[in-house]
From Swiss-Prot:
The lineage of its organism: Eukaryota, Fungi, Dikarya, Ascomycota, Pezizomycotina. The gene is mdpC. It holds the Pfam family adh_short_C2. GO terms for molecular function: oxidoreductase activity. The active site is at S147, S148, Y162, K166. NADP(+) binds at I25, N98, R131, Y162, K166, T197. This is Short chain dehydrogenase mdpC. Transmembrane segments: none annotated. The keyword Chloroplast does not apply.
Length: 265
């Protein structure tokens, strides 16, 4: 391949940072970006061993990666991890904000502490990840935030705090896309539906009526019926869409939220 040849969807020469990528959807995103040729910064808060294992998997794909610890609830740590990423790889082209927490609770029972716990990571942290991404990214960069199909399209009882924390992301994306135009940076979000990760079995019972009466295997089978495609969603399904949004082919996709739930919502 000559220097002037463009390979569609490939990310050679790009540097990507994925927050909360020690496991689950974030890990799949980091691995996919590495598979597409990007150098990857694997950010983690507590999952050091899985993050370091993921770095090795990415390196085995023929690219480079590094694991950097940061609690992105703290803005100073967001700044530090992006500074360190730029110092290590010489630049930054793609920032994916994945870190988040789930929450269930009836409106009448939600505490101030629970509200703040959820919004501090799902909403506030994502805002400042985007701010620092804008400040650190090269021109023609990509910011990809994380919403949820429950933000607007899929209503779930006892889920108002989580849904609201993700709904704010959809407003952020539309306005941030305008703000980032001066650097030719696109801003988009993915909005997954139910996805089978290591957290799936802890939360699936809340999405399915009388879910607490069913086994983990039964819950997964029941969740598969929500999509007209009659299968579960997996982290790689989300990662493939992120890979597209990160690519040159997505340069005309901007300020958009892409729901990735197999048609469930």
């Amino acid at each position: 391949m000559t220097a002037t040849t463009h390979a569609p969807y490939r990310l050679e020469g790009k540097v990507a940072l994925v927050t909360g990528s020690g496991r689950g959807i974030g890990a799949a995103m980091a691995l996919e970006l590495g598979r597409l040729g990007a150098k990857v910064v694997v950010n983690y808060a507590n999952s050091r061993e899985p993050a370091e294992k993921l770095v090795q998997e990415i390196k085995e794909l023929g690219t480079d990666a590094i694991a950097l610890q940061a609690n992105i609830r703290n803005v100073s740590e967001i700044v530090r991890v992006m500074d360190d990423a730029v110092a290590h790889f010489g630049g930054l082209d793609i920032v994916c904000s994945n870190a988040g927490v789930v929450s269930f609770g009836h409106l009448g029972e939600v505490t101030e502490e629970e509200f703040d716990r959820v919004f501090s990571l799902n909403t506030r942290a994502q805002f400042f990840v985007a701010r620092e991404a804008y400040r650190h990214l090269n021109t023609h960069g990509r910011i990809i935030l994380m919403s949820s199909n429950t933000a607007k399209e899929f209503s779930v009882p006892r889920h108002s705090v989580y849904s609201g924390s993700k709904g704010a992301i959809e407003s952020f994306v539309r306005v941030m896309a305008k703000d980032c135009g001066d650097k030719q940076i696109t801003v988009n979000a993915v909005a997954p539906g139910g996805t089978v990760t290591d957290m799936f079995y802890d939360v699936a019972q809340h999405y399915i009526p009388n879910g607490e009466k069913h086994s983990a295997e039964e819950l997964q089978k029941m969740a598969a019926t929500v999509s007209p495609l009659k299968r579960n969603g997996f982290p790689v399904d989300i990662a493939k869409v992120v890979g597209f949004l990160a690519s040159r082919e997505a340069e005309w996709v901007n300020g958009k939220i892409i729901t990735v739930d197999g048609g469930a919502a």
